[in-house]
């Protein structure tokens, strides 16, 4: 981080802003270079809808990081890079946390994730399909979908900017400026693992710049990421059930000794968790694989007009763990079948089971527009954008208890889809004024149309079906403590049915 120099005392230019469904913009920001104490510098603040303004009384907390700054960080995930460079940028790995295992919610200054405005090339970034229902109930863009190789610089306004941008920017603004090189390129391969010997990660990133005619460019960036799972959990030992014989709580509850001392159960425990780790309930990062591409292009039509476009596509797959289901926990219960016999889910999972939660995430965006200036000094930027995010879930190594013996072991519980379409026009012009100001008046205005769509898609029927065992005594064997005709018939066939036993 550069030292923040003292600032020369200056008078702020006066500006008048007129908002007509005011579109979001993001003015460039620059740091003064590192200097000795006492050197007078000026900075350009981020947060103007028109041209940049200088400030003098006090520096607004704006951080600007170059591509070299990003490359100097040992991480390759853009989220982790920002977490390293920006102290107020917070995020963490969230094992066994629903969709947050696959799309990590990030925030500035400890505020909810949807209070940070994320921009790419000064255009609003679409939000991910994940709503953090287990936390703040908010929805934010997935910053991990932006490859670090595609970023030319990052501007972070670490202060509230809601007066300028609305409630989206209460915590601040992050603006990713994409590379615009028309030649050259880069390629890097990073690999490593944790000291525990797991979690091996390999990331391949690259960028290439190509000319587009005589006055244009196409900058193409790509990333491939692969990571093995980690496990930092210990063998399961809760207040109701304990798997670890070395734990002081082992066999403290006599009711489960019938399982822990059963050779069939003991033989099944190593297979309860089909994922990474030698414990029944892993705690760590999921297996993950992702591939992404980001393209930025521009063409100078004439001295006053430029056409631009940029977009991305990313596909990722992750496989994490859920909580261990031990015998008789409400999921693995003995069930009376239609013939009066007993079905025990332990037939499928002798040592209990730990569900696997998989998430396939797709992210797509395209932005295009034209900007320039007219002869009368009016500057314009007219653009449109489309963004889509989709999360598709799979739940494996589990059962639907209500279906009994007929239950499959893998389910598709549903999809989440977020779509955004926006068209906007930004204008600004400098006006002469007789007012005692440090410069001309700036009039900025514009219009915006935004259409947002969120969809929760139901999964396969078996994932939510209430099967026959969703109710007690589904085959009407008992009338209170007395067998019915159907109950008497199965008892006569050798069933152990006992209507006087409320647990039967």
Language-model region placement:
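Transmembrane beta-barrel wall of Gram-negative outer-membrane proteins
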Residues: 183, 196-351, 355-369, 373-374
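Non-catalytic regulatory/gating segments with a bias toward low-complexity or hydrophobic composition
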Residues: 62, 70, 82, 154, ...
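N-terminal periplasmic "start-of-domain" segments of outer-membrane beta-barrel proteins
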Residues: 42-73, 79, 100, 129-135, ...
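Short acidic/polar hinge/loop motifs at secondary-structure boundaries
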Residues: 123-158
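Extracytoplasmic beta-strand/coil segments of soluble accessory domains associated
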Residues: 52, 83-127
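N-terminal periplasmic accessory domains that precede
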Residues: 80-81, 85, 104-106, 119, ...
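Flexible, surface-exposed loop regions and adjacent strand-edge segments
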Residues: 134-135, 235-244, 323-334, 338, ...
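Face-selective signature of the C-terminal outer-membrane beta-barrel domain
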Residues: 298-317, 353-504
């Amino acid at each position: 981080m550069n030292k923040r120099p003292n600032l020369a005392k200056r008078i702020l230019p006066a500006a008048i802003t007129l908002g007509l469904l005011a579109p979001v913009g993001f003015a460039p920001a620059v740091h003064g270079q590192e200097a000795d104490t006492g050197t007078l510098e000026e900075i350009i603040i981020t947060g103007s809808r028109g041209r940049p303004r200088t400030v003098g009384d006090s520096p607004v907390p704006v951080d600007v990081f170059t591509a070299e700054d990003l490359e100097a960080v040992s991480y390759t995930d853009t989220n982790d890079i920002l977490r390293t460079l920006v102290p107020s940028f917070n995020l963490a790995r969230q094992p066994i946390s629903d969709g947050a295992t696959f799309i990590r919610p990030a925030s500035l200054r400890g505020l909810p994730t949807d209070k940070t405005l994320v921009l790419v090339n000064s255009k609003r970034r679409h939000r991910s399909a994940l709503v953090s229902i287990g936390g703040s109930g908010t929805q934010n863009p997935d910053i991990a979908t932006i490859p670090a190789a595609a970023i030319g610089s990052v501007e972070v306004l670490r202060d509230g900017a809601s007066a300028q941008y609305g409630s989206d920017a209460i915590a601040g603004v992050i603006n990713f400026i994409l590379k615009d090189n028309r030649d050259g390129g880069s390629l890097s391969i990073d690999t490593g693992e944790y000291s525990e010997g797991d979690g091996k990660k390999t990331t391949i990133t690259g960028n290439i710049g190509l000319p587009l005619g005589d006055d244009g460019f196409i900058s193409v960036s790509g990333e491939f990421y692969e990571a093995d799972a980690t496990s930092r959990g210990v063998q399961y030992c809760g207040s109701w059930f304990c798997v670890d014989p070395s734990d002081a709580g082992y066999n403290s509850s006599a009711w489960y000794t019938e399982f822990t001392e059963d050779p069939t159960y003991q033989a099944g425990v190593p297979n309860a968790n089909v994922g990474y780790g030698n414990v029944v309930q892993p705690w760590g990062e999921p297996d993950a694989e992702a591939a992404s591409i980001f393209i930025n292009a521009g063409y100078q039509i004439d001295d006053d007009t430029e056409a631009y476009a940029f977009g991305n596509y990313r596909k990722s797959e992750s496989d994490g763990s859920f909580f261990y289901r031990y015998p008789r926990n409400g999921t693995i219960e003995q069930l009376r079948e239609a013939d009066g016999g007993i079905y025990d889910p332990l037939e499928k999972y002798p040592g209990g089971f730990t569900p696997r939660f998989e998430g396939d995430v797709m992210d797509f965006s395209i932005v295009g527009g034209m900007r320039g200036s007219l002869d009368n000094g009016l500057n314009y930027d007219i653009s449109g954008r489309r963004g889509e995010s989709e999360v598709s879930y799979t739940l494996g190594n589990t059962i639907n208890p209500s279906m009994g013996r007929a239950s499959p072991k893998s389910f598709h519980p549903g999809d989440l889809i977020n779509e955004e379409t926006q068209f906007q026009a930004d204008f600004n012009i400098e006006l002469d004024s007789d007012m005692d100001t440090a410069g001309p008046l700036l009039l900025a205005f514009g219009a915006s149309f935004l259409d947002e769509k969120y969809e929760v898609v139901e999964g396969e029927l078996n994932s939510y079906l209430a099967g026959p065992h969703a109710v007690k005594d589904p085959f009407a064997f008992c009338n209170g403590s007395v067998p019915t005709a159907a109950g008497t018939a199965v008892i006569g066939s050798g069933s152990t049915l006992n209507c006087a036993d409320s647990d039967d």
